[in-house]
A protein has these predicted regions:
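Class I (Rossmann-like) S-adenosyl-L-methionine-dependent methyltransferase catalytic domain
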Residues: 1-37, 41-43, 47-100, 140-217
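Short N-terminal helix/helix-N-cap motif within the alpha/beta-hydrolase-1
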Residues: 118-120
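Short catalytic micro-motifs in class I SAM-dependent methyltransferases
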Residues: 112-116
Length: 217
């Protein structure tokens, strides 16, 4: 990708606009949450699966004093973002194993990566991240792989997905090589509750109806 694009600004405009809307929504929540802290108290936030870091760059542009930490499995993806952050705020690897157990956060968000995580592993991740929240902290999931529930299409897609996974499993092929995990609103709420989180609220980004969000404490 980096051989094709020279900077964030060179990326497709539609993709950047989608990320910008998500970042603006996060900024709104951060600003609201910061009012509960002392003026000089740092606000510590962790991004899980930052990718190439465009949303994080937008957050830092808007709030230069934000104590932002990022996680990404690959060192390559953060090539552009590294100049924005101290080295000790970058965690490379798979969470929660790569995260320092002695650091807690006011907010942790997972954006558009949960589709790549099997349900059992996603539950384990939510439980581990909940343990790293400061009192009153928020755990947020932004999902662009949301599956409409109570619809014929949604039920049909789920049924086909189950059949394909069974066939691939029988053939000895790991299904996550080809298919992600799409979840309904009810499934997200259930996973958050199973992880010991209280679901504060959930909904859809106003300008991007396909992006679902859920907040737990």
């Amino acid at each position: 990708m980096f051989s094709r694009y020279s900077s964030w600004e060179a990326l497709p405009a539609a993709w950047r606009e989608n990320k910008r809307q998500s970042a603006e929504w996060l900024l709104m929540r951060i600003q609201r949450h910061r009012t509960t802290k002392e003026p000089n108290e740092p606000f510590r936030i962790l991004s899980i699966g930052s990718g190439i870091g465009y949303m994080e760059k937008l957050l830092l542009d808007a709030m230069p004093d934000l104590e932002l930490y990022v996680n990404e499995p690959s060192t390559v993806g953060l090539k552009w973002l590294r100049s924005y952050l101290p080295a000790d705020r970058v965690f490379i690897g798979f969470p929660p194993l790569c995260l320092p157990p002695d650091v807690s956060f006011d907010m942790i968000y997972i954006s558009a990566v949960d589709y790549s995580i099997a349900t059992r592993d996603f539950l384990f991740l939510l439980e581990a991240l909940r343990a790293q929240l400061l009192p009153g902290g928020e755990l947020i999931c932004l999902s662009s792989s949301y599956l409409q529930e109570d619809s014929y299409i949604g039920s049909f897609v789920n049924a086909i997905k189950i059949v394909i996974r069974a066939v691939l499993h029988y053939l000895g092929v790991r299904p996550q090589q080809f298919w992600g995990w799409r979840r309904t609103r009810r499934e997200y709420q259930q996973l958050f509750k199973q992880a010991g989180l209280t679901v504060e609220e959930d909904g859809w980004l106003e300008k991007t109806a396909e992006t679902y969000w859920i907040v737990g404490r």
